[in-house]
């Protein structure tokens, strides 16, 4: 895949970026270079390579999933103008 001048101008317009003719021409070469690098990456054989999310192996600490009220219901509704049993009361908007 390659990028032409019209594509650069269209992307700049969609991104609301002001680009003059010289900058757009320079970006054509830069974007084509980036796309060429991505195409090289897609040619690499990664069969059998385990996916990784970090360069260092680590595992997230697990905790039990407990349902609680958070013990902050009163603090949350403290500044609300209308409440009832720790629920916000709002005006009816749909009949």
Curated annotation (Swiss-Prot):
It comes from the Bacteria. Its EC number is 6.3.5.-. It catalyses: L-glutamyl-tRNA(Gln) + L-glutamine + ATP + H2O = L-glutaminyl-tRNA(Gln) + L-glutamate + ADP + phosphate + H(+); L-aspartyl-tRNA(Asn) + L-glutamine + ATP + H2O = L-asparaginyl-tRNA(Asn) + L-glutamate + ADP + phosphate + 2 H(+). SUPFAM superfamilies: Glu-tRNAGln amidotransferase C subunit. One of its GO terms (molecular function) is ATP binding. GO terms for biological process: glutaminyl-tRNAGln biosynthesis via transamidation; regulation of translational fidelity; translation. Keywords: ATP-binding, Ligase, Nucleotide-binding, Protein biosynthesis. Heterotrimer of A, B and C subunits. Belongs to the GatC family. Allows the formation of correctly charged Asn-tRNA(Asn) or Gln-tRNA(Gln) through the transamidation of misacylated Asp-tRNA(Asn) or Glu-tRNA(Gln) in organisms which lack either or both of asparaginyl-tRNA or glutaminyl-tRNA synthetases. The reaction takes place in the presence of glutamine and ATP through an activated phospho-Asp-tRNA(Asn) or phospho-Glu-tRNA(Gln). This is Aspartyl/glutamyl-tRNA(Asn/Gln) amidotransferase subunit C. It comes from Rhizobium rhizogenes (strain K84 / ATCC BAA-868) (Agrobacterium radiobacter). The gene is gatC.
């Amino acid at each position: 895949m390659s990028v032409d001048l019209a594509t650069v101008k269209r992307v700049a317009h969609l991104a609301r970026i002001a680009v003059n003719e010289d900058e757009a021409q320079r970006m054509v070469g830069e974007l084509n270079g980036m796309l060429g690098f991505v195409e090289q990456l897609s040619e690499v054989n990664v069969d059998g390579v385990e996916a990784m999310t970090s360069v260092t192996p680590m595992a997230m600490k697990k905790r039990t999933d407990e349902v609680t009220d958070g013990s902050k219901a009163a603090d949350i509704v403290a500044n609300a103008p209308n409440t009832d049993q720790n629920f916000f009361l709002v005006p009816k908007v749909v009949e």
